[in-house]
């Protein structure tokens, strides 16, 4: 069966033949290309990225404080993906950041994480690691967590920092290009070519047909929805996964000081007493700033960053509180569910992020400009719009978030203060779980799927490790 035929422009067929075509230039794609060039430099490797090269990824909002609506968004797309401007935390435990241990086994996942970490160090990552030499302090945090019915997930963290992470990925881009990797920027894959049940290549929005012996989908969180549609179109087996929906919490550094100094990122999990829903902390940014990310069609969601440089630090800590929602039949579009909640918030706030004080959140009233101005805690996201999260979230999620904040207050008092700021909506679009084997082959021969866009990983480190692993599987077949 031929699902797509060659395209033609001005009477001339535009074709290219490569050994490996990688869709997406995020951490998974980068580390896949890196490993291929290290071990098999004779291979012809092509990366296709819908965003810009890293040196051209500039967000005007950093200067103007107002989103310019760039398409594609430089925060989420381009070389290094969303990782380029993230806070750059590398989770060094297989227990955090994805499902590689389930697919490869715990020991193999541990080995790959260590190997990918060594590559980050080679390109300039900070050698210091949080959470490895504070046994007494961590025991005290664990004791408080147990008392609050919270589970502390212990995970060593290497913090790159937003600006240092950018430099590391810049070096990786230069390295790949110097090794002969071809990268097509500002290019979208529009079709996947299937002939007789085998993936043969892709077609781009520039009218080019690229044939490859191996194709890797490494589209990241930004491309998860696109890949879901392609899976349905060409018959790749998938299953509905989890969607995480919640808020970004901002407090003074003093409130989180003990956790920040000893763990940097305290990963805490709670099962709420009312609904028994799983709520977790995620992506803590000490002395960081709350930020806006933009996805397809200008959908604004909240995120957070933290910088290494002292001159860029703030006096506030922010972190995400995410409620995990697992759906059963007949519902099978969790990504759309998360998007609808974010769209509702965007509609209420004119395409910007909503902010509410925890005091108003608990009292069921909207935060006004006046109350926000006299709030003791000053927001780091300056264009956030005061509002009411109860007009956005279902009642169940509101209850889950409130109960989690009350539990966290027992571990680090001050979290449940009236002045605490809640920004919405934070959504993680890693819910399209593609069924893959240990070589990350999909049900379509010749097409492999890795990283956040395939529902395999949820963070920089496991995505990077996933890239190394799939490269080694590819080399066995070429």
State the predicted function of each range.
Residues 2-6, 11-97, 138-478:
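Residues forming the flavin
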């Amino acid at each position: 069966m031929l699902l797509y035929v060659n395209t033609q422009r001005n009477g001339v067929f535009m074709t290219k033949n490569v050994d490996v075509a990688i869709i997406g230039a995020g951490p998974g794609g980068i580390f896949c290309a890196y490993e291929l060039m290290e071990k098999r430099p004779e291979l012809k490797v092509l990366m296709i990225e819908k965003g810009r090269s890293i040196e051209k990824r500039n967000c005007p909002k950093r200067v103007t404080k107002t989103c310019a609506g760039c398409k594609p968004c430089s925060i989420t797309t381009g070389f290094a993906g969303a990782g380029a401007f993230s806070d750059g935390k590398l989770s060094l435990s297989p227990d955090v950041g994805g499902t590689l241990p389930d697919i490869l086994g715990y020991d193999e996942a541990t080995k790959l994480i260590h190997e990918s970490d060594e590559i980050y160090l080679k390109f300039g990552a900070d050698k210091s690691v949080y959470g490895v030499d504070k046994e007494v302090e961590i025991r005290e945090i664990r004791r408080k967590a147990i008392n609050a019915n919270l589970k502390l997930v212990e995970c060593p963290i290497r913090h790159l920092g937003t600006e240092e992470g950018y430099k590391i990925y810049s070096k990786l881009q230069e390295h790949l290009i110097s090794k002969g990797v071809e990268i097509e920027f500002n290019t979208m894959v529009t079709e996947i070519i299937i002939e007789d049940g085998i993936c043969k290549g892709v077609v781009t929005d520039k009218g080019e047909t690229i044939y490859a012996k191996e194709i890797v989908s490494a589209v990241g969180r930004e491309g998860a929805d696109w890949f879901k549609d392609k899976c349905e179109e060409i018959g790749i087996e998938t299953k509905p996964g989890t969607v995480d929906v919640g808020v970004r919490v901002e407090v003074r550094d003093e409130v989180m000081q003990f956790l920040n100094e000893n763990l940097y990122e305290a990963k805490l999990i709670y099962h709420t007493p009312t609904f028994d829903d799983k709520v977790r902390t995620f992506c803590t940014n000490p002395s960081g700033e709350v930020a806006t990310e933009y996805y397809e069609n200008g959908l604004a969601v909240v995120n957070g960053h933290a910088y290494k440089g002292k001159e860029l630090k703030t006096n506030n800590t922010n972190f995400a509180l995410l409620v995990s929602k697992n759906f059963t039949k007949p519902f099978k579009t969790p990504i759309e569910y998360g998007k609808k909640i974010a769209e509702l918030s965007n509609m209420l706030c004119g395409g910007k992020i909503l902010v509410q004080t925890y005091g108003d959140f608990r009292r069921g009233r909207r935060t006004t400009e006046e109350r926000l101005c006299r709030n003791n805690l000053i927001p780091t996201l300056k264009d956030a719009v005061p509002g009411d999260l109860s007009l956005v979230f279902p009642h169940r999620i509101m209850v889950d978030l409130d109960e989690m904040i009350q539990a966290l207050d027992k571990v680090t008092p001050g979290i449940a203060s009236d002045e605490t700021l809640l920004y919405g909506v934070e959504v993680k679009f890693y819910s399209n779980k593609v069924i893959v084997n240990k070589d990350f082959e999909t049900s379509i021969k010749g097409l492999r799927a890795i990283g956040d866009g395939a529902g395999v990983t949820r963070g920089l480190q496991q995505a990077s490790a996933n890239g190394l692993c799939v490269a080694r599987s590819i080399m066995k077949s070429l």
